[in-house]
Amino acid sequence: MRNLYYETTLHKQIRDKRTNRKERIEKDIDSYGNDILVSDELKEAYDQTHHLWSTVGEHTLRVTASSVMICYALRKLGIKANIPAVVVGSLCHDLGILRRDEKYNSKRECSREHPVDSVKVAKEIIPDLTEQSADIIERHMWPAGSSRVPNSLEGVIVSVADKYAAVKDLIKGSDINNTGVRNTIQSEADRIREKHSK
């Protein structure tokens, strides 16, 4: 016999936990990334296609939400990551790609050069960009497209989240895309975009 009270209570706790996690993600991204979220560069990022089915802006927010979620998961294991550096690094990691057709002669050149260009754009938005955030941005292409390994755990987090989001972007619409994690990340990205586009 099923215990409906238990099931209802359990579902409510899970729902409350997910809502709390979403609110924490949004709070962290808003707190540490506000200057970037309101920047003209990130707004422009929504006008440029990226990974076939996405835009640079949508991809960026998925990477950021995924990165923060990884930080929370690691915290449960007793591993503390620098969330402000992760937020700044992930929000800026692909801003150098903007207007890529005007800057790069090939996809290979874009892949190789955009991390350095992204650091330059980040420094325009945040003049006192930390070395750690700059390293996260500059080395985010590892291991696909670059042999330059990130110098910090935070750099690895953003790099992994970037690859995860890129795969999700490429397979958008497939069954593998319809998971709770994907929906959480997408809803966070949508909510942040909506909030900052007003």
Write out the residue ranges for each language-model feature.
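Short glycine/proline-rich turn/loop motifs
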Residues: 41-48
